[in-house]
């Protein structure tokens, strides 16, 4: 079952949030940098009464990410695990995957080649 909750389109970054079988899927398109980090952070912040946050971030549409994006993902991971939930990354483009691996983010946050694999865990 899939429900679309919201869409955020501020400038070069667009974010859509859906729910697939009880898992929040945040689909991101564009560039994640210092100008868009706050928008991404807001999209990844779980509702206070949302229970265990289970989130997959679909990065297939992200063409660029700098350290600002890495920091947002780390904060979202810490928030999710602190609430007995989890965060997974899905379908990063090669340039984003290179950064994720370079900084070791894939050793902290599970990174899957497809959205379907991330949903299955």
Describe every region a protein language model picked out.
Residues 22, 105-108, 114:
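Glycine-centered tight turns that cap/initiate beta-strands
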Residues 20-21, 60, 116:
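Conserved catalytic submotifs in the C-terminal HATPase_c
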Residues 113-121:
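A charged, well-structured terminal subsegment
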């Amino acid at each position: 079952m899939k429900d679309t909750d919201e869409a955020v389109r501020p400038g070069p970054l667009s974010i859509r949030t859906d729910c697939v079988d009880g898992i929040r899927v945040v689909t991101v398109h564009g560039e994640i940098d210092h100008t868009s980090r706050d928008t991404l952070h807001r999209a990844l912040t779980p509702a206070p009464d949302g229970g265990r946050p289970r989130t997959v971030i679909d990065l297939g549409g992200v063409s660029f990410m700098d350290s600002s994006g890495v920091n947002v993902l780390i904060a979202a991971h810490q928030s999710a695990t602190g609430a007995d939930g989890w965060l997974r990354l899905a379908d990063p483009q090669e340039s984003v995957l290179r950064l994720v691996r370079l900084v070791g983010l894939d050793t902290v946050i599970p990174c899957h080649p497809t959205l379907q694999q991330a949903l299955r865990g």
